[in-house]
Amino acid sequence: MSELLIELDNYLAAGLHIGTQQKTSDMEKYIFRVRSDGLYVLDIQKTDERIRQIAKLLARYDPEDILVVATRQYGQAPVKKFGEVTGAKTIPGRFIPGTLTNPTYAKFIEPKIIVVTDPRSDAQAVLESKQNGIPVIALCDTENLLSFVDIAIPVNNKGRKAIALVYWLLARQILRERGTIPEDGDLDIEATDFELKF
């Protein structure tokens, strides 16, 4: 295994590799193994590589041209924090239909690329992106379909700690790619600061 962005134990502690008991043929290539209880386990090496690739891609965009969406509760705090750190636009919470397709809507926006936390729960954002030819990056678990997703990050997209860690790593890598922090530099906040607090 090549060197990871963080220690393997940190990935494991966040449950980033924990999938579901369902899998799609789209996600099969990202699955490392099946546990005895039928739970699919994602390949952390592939997740790590994909985070690097996507950070490199997103770093080439102006921050205001990136939109990050999270409808589900556990994704909202990480998405907000990601926006604060990177300057990307965010929609945590309900995605109003027409946000990307109705120019008369007061909060209409025209991003050049979109990141969704779950292609199923963020389906409206994915659909509107496809209608406008906007590339879609999605955090995808073992049971997700990739029919409208351009690039998937294979990850547990339901776990509070896992989602926070992915957005923290993406933010850190984007800032490294932009040269905002050194190549081996760190953020001044921890991954736990991206988590939803109760």
Swiss-Prot record:
Gene field: rps2
Alphabetical UniProt keywords: Ribonucleoprotein, Ribosomal protein
Taxonomic lineage: Archaea, Methanobacteriati, Methanobacteriota, Methanomada group, Methanobacteria
Pfam family name, one: Ribosomal_S2
Entry's Gene Ontology cellular component terms: small ribosomal subunit
Domain of life: Archaea
Name under which the protein is recorded: Small ribosomal subunit protein uS2
PROSITE patterns: RIBOSOMAL_S2_1 (PS00962), RIBOSOMAL_S2_2 (PS00963)
Family statement drawn from the similarity comment of this UniProt entry: Belongs to the universal ribosomal protein uS2 family.
Gene3D superfamilies: Glucose-6-phosphate isomerase like protein, domain 1
Gene Ontology molecular function, alphabetical: structural constituent of ribosome
Organism: Methanobrevibacter smithii (strain ATCC 35061 / DSM 861 / OCM 144 / PS)
UniProt record, GO biological process: translation
